[in-house]
From Swiss-Prot:
The species this protein was found in: Thermus thermophilus (strain ATCC BAA-163 / DSM 7039 / HB27)
Regulation of catalytic or functional activity: Activity is not stimulated by divalent cations and not affected in the presence of EDTA.
Family annotation (Gene3D superfamilies): 1.50.10.10
Oligomer status and interactors: Homotetramer in solution.
Molecular-function annotations in GO: Glc3Man9GlcNAc2 oligosaccharide glucosidase activity
Protein name listed in UniProt: Mannosylglycerate hydrolase
Family: Belongs to the glycosyl hydrolase 63 family.
Catalytic activity: (2R)-2-O-(alpha-D-mannosyl)-glycerate + H2O = D-mannose + (R)-glycerate; (2R)-2-O-(alpha-D-glucopyranosyl)-glycerate + H2O = (R)-glycerate + D-glucose
Free-text function comment from the UniProt entry: Hydrolase that catalyzes the hydrolysis of mannosylglycerate (MG), a solute produced in response to osmotic stress in thermophiles, into mannose and glycerate. Can also hydrolyze glucosylglycerate (GG) to glucose and glycerate, with similar catalytic efficiency. Is highly specific for MG and GG, and cannot use mannosylglyceramide (MGA), glucosylglycerol, mannosylglucosylglycerate (MGG), glucosylglucosylglycerate (GGG) or trehalose as substrates.
Highest taxon of the lineage: Bacteria
GO biological process terms on file: oligosaccharide metabolic process; protein N-linked glycosylation
EC numbers, comma separated: 3.2.1.170
């Protein structure tokens, strides 16, 4: 199946599902990457992807949920009935967010759309919504103005079962959990998905947030899982820079965004571990770094915050990973005891991460490394089709088939 056909098959009018059957709704960061792919097919459809996300997903407080449940489906768990937010909005949504890459995509669409009237109109419409979302992130998740926001659920990282979350997730109590039936393992080999003990804790957090009626202050105080995720914060820092650029282009006041950028740069660079030569997430509850090397540790390059010396150390680290893995970029250091080459975010290559990290290395002048990240991603898709993720040792496609952001980024990367 061609990349365009994947997007067309997964299109549901104004939004695109990540994969037919496995993921039957609209996901936040998926839609951002998918919009990049639509620009190579239909600029209006690319804008519609993002308009649909904000018009149907965003709450009055600016919060942007990680799932918008546009229609009923029995293929996915937990659905809208479990989240319990049906009364808050139609369509229903989840109660947590996801990496905020969308401002970066809006800037690209604004700058490159050949229809300048449409670009100005759509960007002006989306700018206050983006600003409200970023403002919500800082109010709800950085109340002490550190420049770093916390995630309160592994799903918010986008890297759901990363081994970086093992220890903080182990603190989440599993008590009186209602019986449930996962649907993902009916579509995909269970060996390629998160384990049951992970899901028990994911759901325990969900039910806690539901009891707290999704009150941001209550969640911040009471969530036993509170992590400063280096990947989330790097993506937010890049998004802030792009939001600032949009403000200038649209002649909006950029002062508030500039403050976020200044604090964010200081905060993000504080996550650098000098001894390891790498960026680690921070466990806010335990008050310690999470010393597990994952692909998220390369994302500050996408944000543009490291100095050149740190970028060089990250390039050396990526090259070491590339000596152990046939394909870059594994989601976990292939020499790590946590490395599982076929299980979701514990080892496989993900096309969206390759794209962001390649952008970062390119910006820092590591053209050969950026080229390898691109070439490896394209080779995997050429060989295995547009899969959700890929084994970095064998190249075998894993997870969902006909995966939208893989197809979208293949289109975008080869434009």
């Amino acid at each position: 199946m061609k990349a365009v056909e994947v997007l067309q098959r997964n299109s549901r009018g104004a939004f695109t599902v990540p994969a037919h059957g496995l993921y039957p709704y609209q996901w936040l960061w998926d839609s951002a990457f998918i919009a990049l792919g639509w620009t190579q097919v239909d600029w209006e459809r690319a804008w519609q992807e993002l308009l649909c996300l904000f018009d149907y997903g965003q709450g009055p407080d600016g919060m942007l949920p990680h799932i918008v449940f546009h229609e009923q489906s029995r293929d996915y768990f937990p659905g809208p009935d479990v989240w319990g937010r049906e009364a808050r909005a139609q369509p229903a949504t989840s109660g947590i967010t996801q990496p905020p890459v969308v401002a970066t995509v809006v800037r690209y669409l604004y700058e490159k759309d050949p229809d300048r009237d449409r670009a100005r109109s759509r960007a002006r419409y989306l700018f206050p919504k983006l600003l409200a979302y970023h403002r919500w992130l800082y109010h709800a998740r950085d109340p002490y103005r550190t420049g770093l926001v916390v995630i309160v659920h592994p799903w918010e990282s986008g890297m759901d079962n990363s081994p970086a979350w093992d220890k903080p997730l182990s603190r989440v109590p599993v008590e009186n959990l209602p019986p449930y039936e996962r649907r993902d393992v009916k579509h995909v080999n269970p060996e390629e998905r998160p384990r049951k003990e992970d899901y028990d804790r994911y759901l325990s957090l969900l039910y806690l947030f539901r009891r707290l009626e999704y009150d941001p202050r209550g969640i911040y105080r009471q969530s036993p899982f509170k992590v400063v995720d280096v990947g989330f914060n790097a993506i937010l820092q890049r998004a802030n820079r792009d939001l600032y650029a949009l403000a200038v282009l649209l002649q909006e006041d950029p002062y508030e965004i500039e403050e976020w950028i200044v604090r964010g740069e200081v905060g993000l660079e504080a996550l650098w571990d000098r001894e390891a030569g790498f960026y680690f997430s921070w466990d806010l509850v335990a008050g310690e770094p999470i010393a597990v090397k994952t692909s998220a540790g390369f994302l500050p390059l996408f944000a543009g915050t490291p100095h050149q010396g740190r970028a060089s150390l990250l390039a050396q680290e990526a090259e070491r990973w590339g000596e152990k893995a046939r394909y870059l970029l594994p989601s976990v250091d292939p020499t790590s005891p946590f490395f599982e080459p076929g299980r979701y975010w514990r080892g496989p290559v993900w096309i969206n991460v390759n794209w962001m990290v390649a952008e970062g290395f390119r910006d820092y002048g590591f053209a050969a490394l950026a080229a390898r990240l691109k070439a490896d991603a394209l080779a995997l898709m050429e060989r295995e089709g547009f899969r959700e993720y890929y084994d970095p040792l064998t190249g075998q496609g894993r997870g969902g088939e006909g995966f939208s952001w893989s197809a979208a980024l293949a289109l975008f990367w080869t434009r």
